[in-house]
């Protein structure tokens, strides 16, 4: 069987109410591309795992951690499981728009880019607790690395799997 074009990796922790709407949103947004959805359950204590299993979606792969190891470990596990030519990373909290993925993939392919990174526009966190420190951190990272990504903290990214 031919591997999919995209592996969509979603690290989740206690995202039970978001699983069904997110999966539906992805399936409605990515229509002309072969893809798999890899949910990495990072030790959820709610019914996130059961919601993923109940999807009964042949595109879905579930990777389970027995306890919470954090997003970096979950992302690594998802990448290890991925079989797509490109990897998409996104959050499970419905703040990333899956309808951006086909456009981001097209940009990567047409422009020959290794990475296309999303930007959080309608963030649901507070200005002083999250947004301002994020702007400062993004500026420091840009200036110290010379890599100009507008929002390093945005999980929505598309990149070639051979770079992972």
Put a short name on every predicted segment.
Residues 25, 47, 51-54, 77, ...:
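Alpha-helical transmission elements in cytosolic ATPase-linked domains
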Residues 23, 34-44, 63-64:
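Short beta-strand/loop segment that forms part of the nucleotide-sugar
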Residues 65-67, 71-81, 86, 98-164:
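Acceptor/aglycone-binding surface of glycosyltransferases and processive sugar-polymer synthases
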Residues 41-50, 94:
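A conserved acidic beta->alpha catalytic loop
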Residues 1-28:
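N-proximal low-complexity "stem/linker" segments adjacent to membrane-targeting elements
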Residues 15-18, 44, 71, 97:
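Donor nucleotide-sugar binding loop of glycosyltransferases
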């Amino acid at each position: 069987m031919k591997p999919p074009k995209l592996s969509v990796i979603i690290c989740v922790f206690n995202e039970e109410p978001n699983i069904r709407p997110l999966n539906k949103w992805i399936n409605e947004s990515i229509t002309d591309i072969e893809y798999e959805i890899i949910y990495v359950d990072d030790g959820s204590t709610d019914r996130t795992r059961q919601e993923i299993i109940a999807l009964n979606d042949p595109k879905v792969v579930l990777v389970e951690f027995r306890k919470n190891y954090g997003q970096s470990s979950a992302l690594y596990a998802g990448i290890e499981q991925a079989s797509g030519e490109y990897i998409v990373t996104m959050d499970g909290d419905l703040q990333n728009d899956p309808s951006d993925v086909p456009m981001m993939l097209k940009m990567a392919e047409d422009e020959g880019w290794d990475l296309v990174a999303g930007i959080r526009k309608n963030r649901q966190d507070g200005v002083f607790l999250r947004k301002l420190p994020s702007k400062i951190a993004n500026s420091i990272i840009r200036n110290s690395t010379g890599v100009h990504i507008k929002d390093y903290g945005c999980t929505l990214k598309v990149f070639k799997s051979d770079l992972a």
